[in-house]
């Protein structure tokens, strides 16, 4: 991944005008000094600064970068709409891998995570999740000419001794481990295109990734893939933005505005524009229920 420098970018169709920064380089700004003033909740500080820092991964169509460096994706688009309603027009996007999102937020490298971060029991002990913005399972993906039958379960990947790709630091790695796939048989990638490249180069036998990610790749590239969906031992999960436990004011304001968008149909419309097919019933799944899931 090339190092990104801070810069102003112009909005265009399907993207957002966000400042994009490399991981860890956003901590010494005047804005950071505003955010450390005591006696205010984070929401009030952000409203005074007119700016928020979000951590996000380059994982289209959930969130990512266009070729010109502008930020795009379902989660940042939802965040942009909500922040404008809260009087915070400026958004600084800071690129990170999935595995860096929570540690970076807890270290104050960004104010919250604007991504489709899978809601799990372990993560719920560290952060406060917003309502789900995505409710999706995973695909098992292989090249069409792969030998043998197509696995229907993650446990079959373990029994076959296959080398399997998955998003770096994501819930998929834990799901593979729980299914019995040894860690030395798992290859982690920063994004879905890199995982597909490894599949094409025969560095992995199978990949595990989201249906939305696969659809995005198929739109952009001519690849003959065989896909298992749904995966029998990997049911759909809810994914959401994440907030620090000590920032209830920002969390409550964000979730309140998102629920208004959900009720009006605006949330579903944004998700459809990025290729997601979901229902209000799925997006209304209680976070407490999703937090009970182990992986």
Language model feature labels by segment:
Residues 34-35, 171-184, 258-295:
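Ligand-binding clefts/hinges and TM-proximal coupling segments of bilobed small-molecule sensing domains
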Residues 65-67, 79-89, 154, 170-188, ...:
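Ligand-binding cleft/hinge of the Venus flytrap
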Residues 92-103, 152, 187-197, 235:
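Short helix-initiation/N-cap motifs at beta->coil->alpha
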Residues 135-139, 219-255, 277-295:
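Periplasmic-binding protein-like
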Residues 143-163:
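Flexible hinge/capping segments at coil-to-helix
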């Amino acid at each position: 991944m090339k190092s990104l420098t801070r810069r102003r970018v112009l909005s265009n169709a399907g993207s957002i005008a966000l400042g994009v920064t490399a991981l860890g380089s956003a901590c010494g700004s005047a804005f950071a000094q505003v955010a450390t003033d005591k006696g205010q909740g984070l929401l009030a500080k952000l409203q005074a600064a007119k700016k928020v820092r979000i951590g996000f991964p380059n994982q289209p169509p959930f969130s990512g970068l266009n070729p010109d460096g502008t930020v795009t994706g379902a989660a940042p688009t939802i965040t942009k709409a909500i922040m404008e309603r809260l009087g915070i027009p400026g958004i600084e996007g800071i690129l990170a891998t999935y595995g860096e999102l929570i540690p970076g937020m807890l270290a104050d490298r960004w104010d919250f995570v604007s991504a489709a971060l899978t809601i799990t029991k372990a993560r719920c002990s560290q952060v406060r999740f917003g309502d789900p913005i995505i409710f999706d399972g995973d695909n098992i993906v292989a090249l069409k000419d792969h030998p043998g039958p197509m696995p229907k379960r993650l446990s079959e990947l373990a029994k076959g001794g296959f080398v399997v790709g998955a998003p770096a630091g994501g819930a998929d790695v834990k799901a593979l481990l729980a299914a019995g796939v040894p860690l030395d048989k798992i290859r982690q990638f920063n994004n879905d295109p890199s995982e597909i490249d490894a599949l094409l180069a025969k560095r992995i036998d199978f990949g595990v990734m989201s249906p939305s990610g696969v659809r995005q790749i198929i739109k952009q590239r001519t690849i003959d893939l065989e896909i298992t969906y749904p995966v029998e031992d990997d049911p759909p999960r809810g994914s959401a933005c994440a907030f620090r436990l000590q920032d209830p004011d920002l969390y409550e304001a964000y979730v309140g505005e998102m629920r208004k968008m959900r009720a009006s149909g605006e949330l579903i419309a944004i998700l459809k524009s990025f290729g997601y097919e979901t229902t209000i019933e799925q997006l209304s799944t209680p976070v407490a229920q999703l937090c009970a899931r182990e992986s």
